[in-house]
Amino acid sequence: DATLLLHVNSLGYHEIYLNGRKVSEDVLSPAVSQLNKRSLSVTYDLTPYAKQGINDLLLWLGRGWYRKATFNAVHDGPLVKLRLDEIQANGTASTLLVTDSSWEGRGSMYGETGTGTWYPHQFGGECVDGRKALPDLTTATLDKLDWTPVLEVEVPGIEVSPQMCEPKRIQEIIRPKGIKQIG
């Protein structure tokens, strides 16, 4: 049997979904690095999530710290490159997919607040528009959405290396004790 390995290098944060299922428990991947000098790649085993025939691969991207105000970014991100490799039992590898101008993207329910800046110790925050939330990430839902071609952007001078630290994961969910309206 073959193994499917997805190598993701994002400037900004990412989550990966295949056929509507998140492929790891990681959040806000990759770890933060000196983004004007080094970016980190993360590898995911997609084998348990893949099916015969057509598969839907979805990348959920966020700018995170990759911004012109923080790292003199060439683009206000998020930016991503990925490669999907198939590794046969005998060790033979072939590349099945890479990011290029044929990819499509769209905005999500998350957006900038328009207030604040993104300098160290000054966080601009985000706004969530629940009206844009998707009920699921199935093919039927994704096919109904408007998608636009993505931009290809060259990012010079940044070295890519594998993430060598533990991923960020949710350790505990803290529920509110109460909710009351103020004012």
Which functions belong to the PLM regions below?
Residues D1-A133:
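Accessory beta-strand-rich segments of carbohydrate-active enzymes
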